[in-house]
Amino acid sequence: TQGVSSAASDVYKRQDWHYLWQPLARHHQVIACDMLGFGDSAKPLEHDYSLLEQADLQQALLAHLGIAEPVHLLAHDYGDSVAQELLARHYEERIDIASCVFLNGGLFPETHRPVLTQKLLLSPLGWMLGRTFSRQGLAKSFRQIFGPQNRPSESVLDDFWSLVQSNDGPRILHKLIGYIPERRARRERWVSAMQRGEVPLRVIDGALDPISGAHMVERYRQLIPRADTVLLPSIGHYPQIEAPLAVLKHYLEFRDNLLSPSSRLACS
């Protein structure tokens, strides 16, 4: 079967996809990596982190694994932007994308509402905040962006924090946050790619996410022709953790629909 390439790596990537990995792997070949600067990957301090470089690395991984067939992208958060760049490259015939599903993420700079920690990391003093960032700070941030009925357990927070800490991660948080202005600079390219309509797209979004929740989906419906969206009403920023069964259901439904003749005709 065609591969599912997860372009969804972010600071907490591995824990993000823990609940979906085995169910997806039963149906598809699943490929994912910790992106540069995230999880257990290298986190060089003297490095300019770029979404374009992250897309390059995803393509390099596919080439290394000998994956030549079209890939299906499943992305979240930071990974949404990487997936948008890969989608734009599809239309430049630099990669073959079969479909793309976005979970909560900043698809449009005008609807992205950064939390206080992100704003501070973007400031000239961001490097100081990164070096003092703690598990307590992580827990506070997560409680703001999870749905009120789906607060993360202490065990989940421990797992997330271990990935942030890996390879001295807090010292580069101010470097990684550069994706926010980079999104603004590449908005036209990425939104235009989503509007082309030749690659099937779906958004599965936790509506209560204060960063990229229902307000982002409303904008998506305004800008994207024949918008295919699923709003999860009581869910926050991490639907794959807060409601993994719902995400799996809506993702597999999307993939099944791609096999129908009417779906192929609509996207041809």
Give the positions of each predicted feature.
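Catalytic histidine-centered segment of alpha/beta-hydrolase-like enzymes
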Residues: 232-248
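Alpha/beta-hydrolase-fold serine-hydrolase catalytic core, especially in secreted/extracellular enzymes
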Residues: 259-268
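Conserved catalytic core of two-component sensor histidine kinases
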Residues: 5, 18, 25, 248
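A short, Lys/Arg-enriched amphipathic alpha-helix followed by its capping loop at the start of a domain
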Residues: 19-28, 64
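Single conserved hydrophobic/aromatic residue that forms the stacking wall/gate
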Residues: 1-8, 12
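Flexible "cap/lid" subdomain of the alpha/beta-hydrolase fold that forms the substrate-access gate
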Residues: 10, 15-16, 31, 38-74, ...
